[in-house]
Amino acid sequence: TFLQLDEETAQVQAAQTRASLPLAGLAVSIKDLFDIQGQVTAAGSTVLARAPSALADCPAVARLKAAGGVVLGRTNMVEFAFSGVGCNPHHGTPINPCDVAVARVPGGSSSGAAVSVATGAAFVGLGSDTGGSIRIPAALCGLVGFKPTARAVPTEGAFPLSTTLDTVCAMTRSVRDAITVHE
């Protein structure tokens, strides 16, 4: 599910978060499509593993942090966001937590984000949706996910699949949580 997990930094962030913020201290997972300052954004691929680290958080990550969200880590995804199944040939395919007895796909391309939320590891999973990359894994993992209006959240700092169709969005376990995150 997680390609990078930074529990120590998350604990420090949580301790420093103001309790009055809407996401105060809640764990946030970030799809490996979004820039996080100091980290490489590889879009689920090994080709970009040696790319330069991001100089700043993308606007979506910055907004979640400003709302008190604590970045737990960077999640697995379909390579270059180019499938709705959720498989990644380099990092493995996260198992759909709805039925762990049988290895079922979680849907994609935001597969790791969905699994992180469905297992309770994260309150919200930041992802993207071009042709179903939030809606498909949300449906397969029993979560809430929708494709918001284009540009409702800036796409700068996100690896593009389609610059005219990409949207930034998140998955949660309830509609109430989705409203809190998207406000």
Residue ranges and their predicted role:
Residues 87, 115-183:
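Fold-level recognition of mixed alpha/beta catalytic cores in primary-metabolism enzymes, strongest
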Residues 1-130:
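Gly/Ser-rich catalytic/binding loops embedded in alpha/beta enzyme cores
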